[in-house]
Regions:
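An acidic, low-aromatic, low-complexity terminal/linker signal
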Residues: 1-147
Length: 147
């Protein structure tokens, strides 16, 4: 994938940790961040659908990003952090390991996803930024929540 195929992103990204790697989503999509929430499992749902959460009376689908990105399951007894994103007027939650910071990124620093990304992850990453010696992977939130 080149930057010609995926438009560069810039501005503010809400960053989070997942399996030791730093990811980010555009702040414009983030509604709120919550501590671990009780999940109601959904029978016969795709593996990436961790369940449903009750967000002040609104039922919201919870997507397990570890599953979507082909990462190992969250260690037993470890709670996820919930990032609620709003897309096309609908709320969806993303389960991550830990929330990091909101960072400003320059579209000129946008790079194509690393060649080392494979499988499911390659399709969900828009690109990368080098941030203080750390690689920040920009998640395509629309693809991440799509079946």
């Amino acid at each position: 994938m080149s930057t010609a195929e995926a438009p560069a992103i810039g501005g503010q990204l809400a960053t989070f940790w997942l399996d030791g790697d730093l990811y980010g989503v555009e702040v414009a999509h983030v509604q709120e961040v919550l501590k671990s929430q009780g999940l109601t499992r959904v029978p016969l749902a795709p593996a990436a659908v961790a369940g449903l959460i009750n967000l002040r009376g609104q039922v919201v689908t919870a997507i397990e990003l570890r599953e979507r990105l082909g990462r190992p399951s969250r260690p037993e007894g470890t709670d996820a952090v919930v990032i609620v994103v709003r897309l096309h007027g609908e709320a969806v939650s993303l389960l991550v390991d830990a929330i990091a910071d909101v960072v400003d990124v320059d579209p000129a620093d946008f790079e194509a996803p690393p060649d080392t990304l494979a499988g499911q992850a390659r399709d969900l990453i828009r690109g990368a930024f080098k941030l203080d010696g750390q690689l920040l992977l920009a998640l395509d939130v629309h693809k991440a929540v799509s079946p």
